[in-house]
């Protein structure tokens, strides 16, 4: 359904697009997914909030800067994509969607995240890349089930020590930030499998050989004097990594992301909540 909508709205003027989308969505799709990506939306169609068994909602690549409080009716929602919009702050209503597992917030104008985000204790994947973050919000460290964190292309200079509380975290993407040192907290997270610090300003890498779960470290495009030491079998992408020609770090990242997304598609079986009569 989402692809069909995008194909049509590409030819519809922006001032008429909102009305078209509203008319098109008369009832909840059988797959419990609504994809309004690239629909030129300035306002979220409130009547979608009546689809109380909705599981996936994609609002990527629109012009949204707010969401209605009625969104809180979607208590079965597990995936919410708000990337490529105009949000300067995360709408509080998002923090009421307690079954969310995957939240995409990349390519907005976020400078921080609200404390209420800690209410999303089912969150496994959080993407906040390409925002205006100068520090990683400490509330992220309270998301105890988080497995994947993508915070690349911000202005991060360090990571909070509390990050090591996230014992389920397996993948952290920090490319394109302002790190001048390898984040010390990552040295105390032996369960990490993928670390990406590509395109930072790191001059020296400590040994990562003790990180027993590590599978891939991407450290290219840093002014480093050495390659990070890793355990046997760990793949490195960056200067001095191997004697053989090193792979393209972008391809390595895309491969890892594709692998993660295939795993994310297997959402945990959360029981649907009964619809309310409100």
Swiss-Prot record:
It comes from Bos taurus (Bovine). It is found in: Nucleus. The gene is LRRC10. One of its GO terms (biological process) is cardiac muscle cell development. GO terms for molecular function: actin binding; alpha-actinin binding. Residues 239-278 are annotated as: Disordered. Keywords: Leucine-rich repeat, Nucleus, Repeat. InterPro entries: Leu-rich_rpt, Leu-rich_rpt_typical-subtyp, LRR_dom_sf, LRR_domain-containing. May play important roles in cardiac development and/or cardiac function. Residues 269-278 have a biased composition (Pro residues). It holds the Pfam family LRR_8. This is Leucine-rich repeat-containing protein 10. It comes from the Eukaryota. Its main location: nucleus.
